[in-house]
Amino acid sequence: MEKKLKKLEDKINYNFKKIDILISALSHKSFDPINNYEKLEFLGDRVLGIIISKKLLELYPNEKVGILDKKFASLVNKNKCYEIGKSLELDKYAIVGNNKKKTKVENKIISDCCEALI
């Protein structure tokens, strides 16, 4: 498992000081009802929102808020996070319970893992 997680760290160009955080970021509640990605996903979503908002204001300082809001919505959404998660092959790293292992990892889980990694 550690070798597999090291590959992911290499992909995202970040080495976790506490590997438990990475494991939690990849763990669905069906695997671990307590130490799963839900809170990290919540935080990641907020961090992503702040970063994208700041960048949009830098790139478009004179743009109307309505236009900025549309640009923001096109960049910060579950589909975009899914695309990024899929490009990182997070479906191969997601840790799910036995009831979820029978089928392919759902798009939402990939998207959620992506936000949790942020």
Task: Give the residues covered by each predicted segment.
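RNase III-family endoribonuclease catalytic core
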Residues: 1-118
